[in-house]
Amino acid sequence: MFSFFYRFNWNFIKWNLVDNTVSLTQHKIYLASKKSDIFLVKNKQRRFFKSFYAHIFSVRNCFEKFPSLQSYFYSSKDKFFLVSLLSSKRNLFLHGFFYNIKKAFLFYSYDFFLLYKLSFSLLLTSTLLPYINDINPCFIKDYYFFVEGNFFDFEQILIDVFKYSYYFKVENFKFLYFARFSWIYKNFPLDVNFLKNFLDRKNLVFFKSLFLIIFNFIFNGLNFFFQENFFISYKVYYLFYIDKFYFFFKFPYDFFICKKIIISFFSLRGIILNININSFYRFETFVFNFFIFDFLRFGSNILLHINKKHIQFYKLSLKMIVKMFLKKSVFFLVNLLNKKILDCLNRGFFCFNNNFLFLELDLYLYRLLWRYIKKLHSRKTRTWIYSKYWKFFSGIWRFFITDIKTGNFLFLKSHLYSSKYFYSYRNMKFKISNTLNIFNLYNKGKLERMIFEKFKYKFSPNFIVLYNNQRGLCFFCKKSIYSNRFVILNIKKWNFSFFENLILIHFYCNNFNQLQ
């Protein structure tokens, strides 16, 4: 068998012929599924699953869709060897060699088990995907093993789901333990012996791609079942995570209809639900827990409550970037931190206390940078470090660095003031004050007073004379004037000079009763 592979070169294959053959076969399977001819679909899919075109198509896509698998590292012999093992006679997964596969291929210099697993996943995908109409993005993690050429964004799922006002959930929903496997054996278009080896509870192997395909196969046709039997016009949305099943609907009187639909639909699939569903929840009053997040709808916005573990994990990642950074290039470090901050903000986190949360993250990041810069310039004073790395820009103290080699300058991005964070799903933007101080919030008054002392000479000469005569204090409240919101009053005492008739007060102290 190995001598046969030496005669061929992987690069000389006519891939146009392979792509056209695979596309034509998938289109025939799709047309047969529209006619509801199950036996014809199973016959075509079994032939396509055993064909040489499907095997070589899956191995090629394995290298293209996973860039970490460098194609030049594998020879043509290795790739054709994978193609031969995907055949029905030599397929390791079809014959149940789940536990001995790693031991059998330990002598290979590359991770053969991972490569074979990905190729087999894509083979199942290309074979079964044309038959499944309702592709439900229930499994967010590792879903790319199943859906070929499609990526379901988690934010887009939330946008669609949160259009609905109510939901109910079914817990401890393990369909592999509730299902009667006879329905799956009869309708699932794969070898029966292979399914028996996989679905056997004694030898159950959690092979993710096949698990997802069986799941979507069981739920296939749920939307059509709704619209045909119960005359519901809107689309059905449901999510499935581990052992929890969530179902979403618009109106409260649809709850009993949806409950009846689910029980009758699953009974046709051989799944008997013995769980009582007696209550439903509203998004505005009950938190929707999915994955490790808690969601709540507030008006037109989706609010996300970020738990403490999430914040601690993100802080730890920032700390590891700063602490494990071995180079002395602060410019490169700030660039890495900016990418990390953008990656965090692009997730679209929404919570009630977003200002306090992101202010806390900014302060934590500035403390990390202060310790790093202090170690980098151990002989320099604090004043020198502040003047070199922190600049007052647009009313905010920001970390600033200049690259000496290229002359480029870079500001450290902020969690709180980043424009990419303040958005909603309806493009509603939020505005915040530019006078807030992030770096030293407790000395905000001293900072404003210092800035005022620096720029007070740019005002009119009359103001400077009054300011110096009153020693920078208001005439009434005797508090400092370090704001541009002040008033100059003429008390009209003709016995005095011109400047003695004028007083400088705060705008809120402008009470003429106090002049009497």
From Swiss-Prot:
InterPro entries referenced in this protein's UniProt entry, alphabetically: RVT_N (IPR025960)
Subcellular location: Plastid, Chloroplast
Source organism, top-level taxon: Eukaryota
Statement: the UniProt record of this protein carries the keyword Plastid: yes
Tagged with keyword Chloroplast: yes
Main location: plastid
Annotated GO CC locations: chloroplast
Keywords: Chloroplast, Plastid
Pfam families on file: RVT_N (PF13655)
Additional information: The protein migrates at 80 kDa in SDS-PAGE gels.
Family (UniProt): Belongs to the roaA family.
Protein name according to UniProt: Ribosomal operon-associated A protein
Source species: Euglena gracilis
Protein encoded by which gene: roaA
